[in-house]
Each structure stands twice: as structure tokens, then as C-alpha cells.
Amino acid sequence: MLTGGTTARASIAILLLDALILAPALLVAQDWPQILGPNRNGIYTGPPIVPSFPRGGPPQIWARDVGAGFAGPAVSAGTLILFHRLNNREVVDAMDAATGKTLWTFEYPTSYRDDFGFDEGPRAVPVIAGGRVFTHGADGWLHGLDVKTGRRLWSVDTRRVFDAPKGYFGVATSPLVDGTRVMVNVGGKTGGIVAFDAASGKTVWTSTSDGASYSAPVVAHIAGLRTAVFFTRTGLVALDPANGSIRYQYRWRARMAASVNAAAPIVVKDQIFLSASYGTGAILLQVANNAVKPVWSGDESMSNHYSTSVLKDGYLYGFDGRQEFGQSLRCVELATGKVMWNVDGFGAGTLLIADHTLVIMRESGELALAPASPQGFRFNSRAQLLPGVVRAYPALADGRYFVRNERQLRAFDLTRR
């Protein structure tokens, strides 16, 4: 039993420990260090943003020319990382997020060619974690860099090492960092999912021979277990991030070969939501006793092609349908799959949620703000921020909105004054 001054000292120690535990969360709450934000769920938790802006749009802070690619920016501790292609080199640029000024550059040659004539730049959003930057290039090169200097720490040619095919549109899955491991859906015959040591790049474990998807994996506590959740080319793979052992799988993919799984899985308590296009649709899975069973499924609720839906208060907001055929924007009740509202012909895009506001970037380059409400859709504000085509995921960090097309990266101020 603790008594007297010992109790007081113990209480102070506990308070200090709590402060140390909470401090990192406070520091990173304003960051956007990876695809879909700090928790890979599309939710912004930084300083409040404006619910609307003037007809001319929010104030532009800076702009700069960039190379090819669909990889959106990542932002951490005031540093923005952009992964793009200039001529025949894949380039990682670190910039001051406040000014756009270059801090350092790392580059290496690439020979990637798109078989369908699309953009040939990198597709995967970089990850900033533990003082390092991790990039996954269109031709499969995985790099670990020092975030302060850009110094190359290690690199792995994942396609060669794990005998992975090129894929329909190149390599496009963002790495997942969990502690000392970097996990990637490599899609190789000798390693479908691979964990690398974050410091050295050495292989820690391999699991499955599933093909690579374009979906970003997530890590979460599910049914009391810390679990890495991948939506591979075949479907759901949930595994132990410590050793790669498979906990459960569920096949979910289109019947046609020329298709992709691209939306990130969404984990809510002990349930997992998956969505794909090409007539596949969505499924909500219940996890229990290291197994999964469907709660509901169907192609009539939310058919995500490339863009991931965002969950808010039990409702999914996202883009339904094939990108090239014209998409609708809709709201779906997660528990039932019921469509609450639908805006037909809205067009493709991406979205995130800040407080109760949908922050929508349309493929045309128009930014739209709207209430995140299942009661219906209405615009609060809309403005053209840059010319289309905009397919890269934007980043929202410390009230600044960073968005790129195939030629420029621009920063805008959305901070509520």
C-alpha cells in the first residue's frame, strides 16, 4: 500500500506518464502523415476549418509546379512530402508546408510505362513515421528515407525480390507502418504481404501469395486483438502484425480479371466494411472467434472504385460507381446498407470529413464543402481550385488544404478565424 508522500509522488508520476502518452497525440492531431490522415479513416482532427468560403474560394497560400503522378502529399511537423515523377526519375521532395520551399530532394531512375497510356508517375501516397519517410514507387521500389535530410536508409526492389507482376496500372498500394514494421501488399509469388524492418528494410515476415491491390491497409484492435487488415486483389486478409500469421480471410473481388480493389477497408469495433466496383459492391463483415460472417452485402449500396468512403456517426459518405462511367455521391447507413441520399451524376472525386463538414475534391478540380448529414445533401460552398484532372488524395493539416493535379501542387487556407 502506498501512503503519505509516496502516494503523492506516485500520483504525480501517473499524471506525468499520462501527459507523455497524450503528448504525441496532441502533436500529431494536426498532421496528415499518410493516406486518409493520421488514422487512415479520412477524419481531420486539427484546428477547426471554415464551414463555407467566399465565391472566389479559400485564400491560396502558395503554388508550385510538380511532375506526374497520382500520389497525394503527406504532412508531418511542418514538413510536406510529395512523391512525383520528373522525366525518367521518381522524385521525393520535402517542402516547408507553410511556404512550399524545398527542404531536400531524393530521386532515382524509373523505367515504368503504363500499358493503358495513363499517367506514369507514382501512385502511392508516402508515409511519414518515426523520423522516416517511406515511399512505394510505380515500378515497385520501396524506399526508407530520413525525414530531416532525405538520406536513403534502405531500398528494396519488391517486384524482383518477391516475384511480383507489374499490375494493370503499376504499383499503387501505400505502405502501412506499425511500430518497427513497414507492411506492404507486394503481391508477389513468394510474398503477397510482406513486413520490412523500418530501420533496415530487412524482411521480417511474409504472408500469403495474394496479388497486390491498390487499397491502403489499416491496423486496428478487432475482437481484442491488434490486427493488420489488408484488402488484397483477392479480398480481405486479416493478420497478426507481429508475425504475419493469418487470423481470417474473406474473398471479395470482381469476377472479371481486369479489375482492382482500391478502397481502404473500414474497421468499426468488431466489424469490417469492404467495397469494390465492377459489379462487386459492398459487404459488412462481423468478426468473432477469429472468423468473419456477412452482416449484409450488395452492389446497390456503396460501390467504391478508387476513392474510399468516410464513416461519420454510423453513416458512410462516398462515391458510388465506376470512375469512367460517372459516379454519384451518396450517404449510406453502415449497419444496414440503406442509401440515405444520392446525388446522381456528381462525378468522381475524393472526400474527407472535418468535424461535421464534407470536404470534397471533385476530379474536375472543384472544392466543395457540405454538411455531413444523413438527412440530405446541399452545398455550403464550392469553388474551382485548380484545373482537372485531380485524382490524387489531398491532405488537410493544421487548417491548410494541399491538393495537386498533374502539373501543380497548391496550398489553401481553410482555417476558421
Residue ranges and their predicted role:
Residues 11-25:
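Bacterial N-terminal signal peptides
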Residues 96, 146, 197, 240, ...:
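Structural recognition of the beta-propeller blade-terminating site
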